[in-house]
Amino acid sequence: MFKAKSERADYVSKIVVEVDGMKFDGDETSQDRMARSVVALNDDNETVQWVLADNTIAQVTRVQLKQALRLAGEAQTAIWANPYL
C-alpha cells in the first residue's frame, strides 16, 4: 500500500491540464493557488498574471483558472482511489 500511495503522489505532482491552449500545472499546490485566485478575483473577466506549466507568463481570467482547477481536481480524483482498487 505504501508503494501505491507513493506512486499516486508522484502522478498527482505531475498533473498538467490545458485550458484555451494554455497548460497549467495541476499538482495540489497549484490547485491551492488557483483556488485562492478564483476566490480573490471579483469578476469572471478580471485577469491575473500566471506562470504556466512551461514557465511562460500569461494573463488568465478567473473563468480560465476555474476551468483549470476543475480539470486538475478531476484528474486528481481519477488517480486518488487507485491504491484502494
Language model feature labels by segment:
Residues M1-L85:
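A preference for well-ordered globular domain cores
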